[in-house]
């Protein structure tokens, strides 16, 4: 339906999932580390359902004859797969999918690793498909120390909630995850303020442009501005406005 009302502009994204809490509720007993198996069986079925009636009796999914109605306008809807490990890069290229990667809070070397895995998967698939490569990073553009401090405080709070969901460490009340204190987490050095400012797309417009140019040189085709970092609405609007007004023109 979305492809229909958008005039054939749907791009479909799929991933293996991340939060053990979600797996516990959707499929009790399913380990987070096994989510990719379900995703890999699912994607060909989604594509088949877009074409017409299909029934399936597989290892992970079973259903009688069904289809998608209305059908997509596009003969082939572009598909994006979220990938961070070689097995998922290989799968994405076998299925002729574009790839989106997210280095979490890690440094640029993590993005370089993903590009190496992508190139290896392209060579391994050897099917003539050249994917678009997107990189997602938390982003905050600011002009002074107060803006920097607000962005760092916000992302540290959100990361504490992320760890709660990812590792199933705390409770969720009325839809809001409890923040796990970062100083209690193993590997907490990855949430150091200076490291976050360096690794994420944080900084003045000039700094963010320089950071993005590194991704462009690496071979990243598209950048996803990850705005979900807990900033207040006004601060978030200011950041996005700076990005639109002063960062985007550098890449046009």
Give the ranges of each region predicted by the language model.
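Internal, glycine-rich beta/alpha segment that forms the wall or movable "lid"
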Residues: 1-97, 109-112, 116, 124
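Short, electropositive alpha-helical surface patch
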Residues: 3, 72, 155-157, 240-245
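Hydrophobic faces of well-ordered beta-strands that scaffold small-molecule active sites
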Residues: 10-14, 79-82, 97-102, 131-138, ...
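Active-site-proximal loop/turn and secondary-structure-junction residues that shape catalytic pockets
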Residues: 16-20, 85, 105, 139-141, ...
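Glycine-rich, proline-tolerant flexible connector loops at the mouths of alpha/beta enzymes
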Residues: 22-23, 102-108, 226-239
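An alpha-helical appendage that flanks or caps ligand/catalytic pockets
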Residues: 32-68, 109-220
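Alpha-helix-loop-beta-strand connector modules within alpha/beta enzyme cores
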Residues: 38, 42, 240-252
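Short glycine/threonine-rich loop-to-helix capping motif typified by GTGT followed
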Residues: 143-149, 234-242
């Amino acid at each position: 339906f979305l492809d229909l009302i958008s005039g054939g502009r749907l791009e479909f994204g799929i991933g293996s999932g991340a939060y053990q809490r979600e797996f516990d509720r959707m499929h009790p007993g399913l380990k987070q580390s096994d989510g990719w198996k379900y995703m890999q069986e699912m994607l060909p079925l989604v594509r088949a359902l877009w074409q017409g009636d299909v029934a399936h009796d597989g290892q992970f999914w079973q259903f009688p004859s069904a289809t998608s109605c209305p059908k997509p306008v596009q003969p082939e809807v572009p598909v994006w797969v979220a990938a961070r490990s070689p097995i998922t890069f290989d799968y994405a290229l076998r299925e002729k999918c574009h790839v989106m990667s997210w280095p979490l809070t890690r440094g640029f070397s993590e993005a370089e690793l993903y590009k190496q895995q992508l190139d290896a998967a392209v060579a391994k698939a050897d099917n003539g498909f050249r994917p678009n490569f997107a990189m997602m990073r938390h982003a905050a553009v600011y002009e002074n120390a107060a803006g920097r401090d607000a962005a760092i405080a916000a992302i540290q709070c959100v990361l504490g909630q992320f760890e709660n969901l990812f590792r199933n460490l705390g409770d969720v009340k009325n839809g809001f995850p409890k923040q796990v204190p970062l100083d209690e987490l193993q590997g907490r050095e990855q949430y150091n303020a200076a490291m976050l400012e360096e690794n994420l797309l944080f900084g003045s417009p000039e700094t963010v442009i320089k950071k993005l140019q590194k991704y462009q040189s690496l071979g990243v085709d598209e950048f996803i501005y990850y705005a979900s970092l807990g900033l207040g609405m006004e601060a978030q609007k200011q950041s996005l406005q700076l990005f639109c007004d002063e960062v985007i023109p550098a890449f046009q």
